Amino acid sequence: YSLMGGLTEFAGQLCDTLNRTTGRTAVITDRDNIISVSGAPRRELMDKQISPDLERLMEGRQIYQHKGGEDGIPLCDNDGRFFLDTVAPILSEGDVLGSVVFTSPEDELGGGEVEYKLAQSIAAFLGKHMES
């Protein structure tokens, strides 16, 4: 059972907004799976299990952004097509509920400050929303 499950439609609207604002593929996950996608690969990514590396990043409770020259970290388990560009964990009352992610193929990685701040803001908003 996912606490984020009830937010699927709302998360979809947020992903659409992030995608329109940045032109990047935006994803929202719960602790196990992708619950919302906006951008090119929606059908390929929706409901897929997240990678163990993404789980570890979320548990670290810090925002992650790919740095040039580093190997890409896969978004999904057993799927090397999409990689983590920017990840902000969704925290509610100290618990990790999921993450806001910008993703792209490995050769297109390169999020900047805009993606960082947007992911941070949406993750904080969702965390607060879940507390109420």
What are these regions (language model features)?
Residues 90-100:
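Short hydrophobic/glycine-rich mini-motifs in sensory/regulatory modules
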